[in-house]
Amino acid sequence: MPPRLVRKALNTYHHGDLRDALVQAAFQEAERGGPEAINISALAKKLGVSQPAPYRHFADREALLEAVTAEAFRQFNVILRELIDKPSKQSKLSRFAQATLAFGLQRNGIYRLMFASRTMACAPKGSELHKAAMETLALLIESLEAPAVGLLRERQAMKMWASLHGVVMLAEQGLLTGQAAGGVSREELVEDMVQEAKLALSVAMKAAERGAH
């Protein structure tokens, strides 16, 4: 971009769009280095605004992290929705699980922002981040393709989410190779988890139905 256009873009930050610019710039930093790479002072310098300017939009770093994490979940949800709705011989749960594995490894900085920091856990109920994260969970529950029987779907969804997170974090650390992974690929391991989850849910639902009669 020519320098003259850059200066014009930076000047507009004082007229309302600095918030979006901060979120996008912070997102890029997280993409490269995870949540720890996000620094408000560095972002202000990068965007060419005064050090106090970001605080007109975000009370502190945590508030900025919350906005960036919400955006990450929204982008992730778009990916998941497209995959779940796309006709395929794979089950919806398999598509969800494999997409999560790929996202976690290929975009690990963003994944760690979403799942390996305290930001999501501290998000107030009803906040943009909370709503975006709950949409991810809803997509996982939908991908189970099972009727509602008590809270069995939700419980199995949380088990699956926890298992997937474990695989991503172990794989990211290089701990799922060779004999440590039983000689199977990460994708095969995740597919095993998918099949076991579907079987466990089916057994639990049949037991619940028998107990109801």
Language model regions located:
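Amphipathic C-terminal alpha-helical segment
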Residues: 162-180, 196-210
